[in-house]
């Protein structure tokens, strides 16, 4: 019977070949692809926020946002881009000795800050486009509320939520690689990414949109007044939206995303599908 998808072993093989290429990209290309990916994820965040901001029921709001947000990763898969969270899977090449730790870390650092640049570009465009004026400024107030919630997260929650998030993101990437046609790839991306949004898990690159755009919105008195009225936020909470306080989110969430992608997905997949278990078993018996 004809097979219309790649097997898990084939997926890991293909992902490792792609990971080796990612680690050895020229610096300029790596930066440009990172900027693109950050911008695409930010566009997913912006449009999903617009769709969900006026919905009072939390579960329904997350469901609606979850339907829209996956477009960001879909664009990256089909158009191109280097996404920090997905590139955590390069760890498979490190374990397989195709890439050095230095090359892996270099890629992750360059891509991380390139993603940030791309997200900040979209943050700025969204703010000055008037998009946050929707519903009498409620979207701007919503941006503030989301950012306040994110900078107030505890380190433990940030790490554990980041782990859960990148398990799903990396699974989405591997599932998309398993599909052999466009429709299959779309659905393969859609459900895991929707799950992480509905679950409310923390994604460091998505937060490069949510936190800065909330900080920008906090400079607008109209949005601030609306946030205080609609969500009961205090002046102190809103004033806490600073670059320094944003690190309360970015540091633990980034650590969690790395652990989720590397320890919970990348390394186990390598050992399941690439390690020569029979040879290892024979060596163990002879030892």
Label for each model-derived stretch:
Residues 1-287:
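Alpha-helical transmembrane segments and their helix-helix packing motifs
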């Amino acid at each position: 019977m004809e097979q219309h998808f790649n097997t898990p072993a084939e997926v890991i093989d293909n992902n490792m070949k792609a990971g080796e290429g990612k680690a050895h990209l020229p610096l300029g290309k790596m930066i440009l692809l990172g900027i693109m990916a950050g911008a695409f994820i930010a566009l997913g965040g912006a449009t999903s926020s617009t769709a969900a901001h006026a919905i009072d029921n939390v579960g329904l709001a997350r469901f609606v946002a979850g339907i829209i947000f996956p477009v960001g990763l879909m664009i990256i898969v089909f158009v191109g881009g280097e996404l920090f969270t997905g590139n955590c899977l390069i760890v498979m090449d490190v374990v397989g000795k195709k890439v050095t730790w230095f090359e892996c870390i270099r890629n992750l650092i360059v891509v991380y800050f390139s993603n940030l640049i791309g997200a900040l570009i979209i943050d700025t465009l969204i703010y000055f486009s008037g998009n946050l004026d929707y519903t009498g400024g409620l979207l701007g107030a919503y941006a503030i509320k989301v950012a306040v919630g994110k900078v107030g997260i505890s380190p433990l929650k940030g790490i554990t939520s980041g782990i859960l998030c990148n398990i799903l993101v990396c699974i989405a990437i591997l599932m998309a690689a398993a599909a052999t046609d466009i429709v299959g790839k779309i659905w393969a991306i859609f459900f895991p990414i929707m799950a992480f949004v509905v679950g409310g898990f923390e994604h460091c690159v998505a937060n490069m949109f949510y936190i800065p755009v909330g900080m920008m919105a906090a400079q607008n008195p109209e949005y601030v007044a609306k946030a205080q009225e609609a969500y009961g936020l205090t002046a102190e909470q809103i004033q806490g939206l600073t670059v320094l306080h944003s690190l309360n989110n970015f540091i633990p969430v980034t650590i969690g995303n790395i652990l989720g992608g590397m320890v919970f997905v990348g390394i186990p997949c390598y050992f399941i599908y690439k390690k020569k278990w029979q040879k290892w078993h024979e060596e163990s018996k002879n030892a």
